[in-house]
């Protein structure tokens, strides 16, 4: 029965997330802020709302490992989808160059992942009031990221969307429904995890919550690529990943028992490590100025897709 309710609220959460993204796009259409701010903050924040609610709910349900799996699994899935769509849309993306704003986001992501990995490996073990060092670094770097985002009005998003009446009211109502749906979704996933003790809560969180809550980002990414706006699409994905880590730091703060990173298990550690590798590969792929051919361009994407499928289909199952 838990599985049926999970599917119901998973579809509802995805639907509400899509609606939120549409409303955010319409709201940004009349805005004078830059593409980087809209992609890195507005779209990333709106599409990451399910992660925020499900992550917080996991802590309140006293299953912090579910929260870790959710965030790390979501980030892993995001990069996997980026690589997969790189392959599918190779003709559109091959000649596209990304901005330096994306480089900044990638670098901050890599630093955050390295700090978390070193912390759980006990290379650095600094805590303040039961809050882990990674949380402090994530928060500081996120504020630096916001500060450094270009806020000029020159670079505007041009997305052909029909104006929506009373958009702010609809955005608010949809957000409230999203919160309720995400809480119930997390509750049923937690029940599934409790009824399957042979599986890690982190892995279940990564699969059921991580992938479900990431689908809005995937849809946004696909839509932006289809209208030849790869730079904004990439900014949305890496910006969402960065925002997800900020959510994880919030979870660490409200999880008062110990740093949340201390309860990570082997499966979740593997997800973290794969996430770090994927982000580095994706970063190196996007900073290249020249490629000999489409084949050499697409090799990193093939590596990411292959590793992801191997981990879930062979390594885990």
Show where each model-derived region lies.
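Hydrophobic alpha-helical segments, chiefly the membrane-spanning helices
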Residues: 1-317
């Amino acid at each position: 029965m838990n599985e049926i309710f999970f599917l119901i609220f998973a579809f509802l959460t995805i639907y509400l997330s899509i609606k939120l993204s549409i409303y955010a796009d319409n709201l940004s259409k009349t805005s004078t802020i830059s593409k980087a701010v809209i992609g890195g903050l507005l779209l990333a924040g709106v599409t990451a709302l399910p992660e925020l609610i499900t992550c917080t709910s996991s802590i309140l349900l006293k299953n912090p490992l579910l929260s870790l799996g959710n965030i790390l699994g979501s980030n892993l899935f995001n990069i996997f989808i980026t690589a997969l769509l790189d392959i599918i849309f190779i003709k559109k993306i091959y000649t596209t160059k990304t901005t330096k704003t994306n480089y900044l986001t990638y670098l901050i992501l890599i630093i955050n992942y390295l700090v978390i990995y070193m912390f759980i490996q006990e290379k650095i073990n600094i805590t303040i009031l039961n809050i882990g060092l990674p949380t402090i670094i994530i928060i500081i770097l996120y504020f630096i990221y916001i500060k450094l985002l270009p806020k000029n009005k020159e670079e505007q998003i041009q997305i052909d969307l029909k104006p929506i009446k009373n958009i702010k009211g609809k955005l608010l109502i949809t957000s409230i429904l999203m919160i309720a749906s995400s809480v119930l979704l997390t509750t049923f996933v937690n029940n599934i995890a409790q009824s399957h003790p042979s599986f890690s809560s982190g892995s279940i969180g990564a699969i059921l919550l991580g992938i479900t809550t990431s689908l809005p980002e995937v849809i946004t990414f696909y839509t932006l690529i289809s209208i030849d706006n790869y730079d904004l699409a990439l900014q949305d994905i890496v910006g969402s990943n960065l925002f997800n880590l900020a959510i994880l730091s919030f979870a660490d703060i409200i999880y008062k028992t110990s740093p949340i990173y201390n309860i990570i298990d082997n499966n979740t550690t593997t997800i973290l490590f794969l996430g770090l590798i994927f982000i580095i590969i994706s970063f190196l792929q996007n900073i290249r100025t020249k490629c000999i051919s489409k084949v050499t361009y697409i090799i990193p994407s093939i590596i990411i897709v292959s590793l992801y499928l191997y981990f879930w289909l062979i390594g885990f199952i």
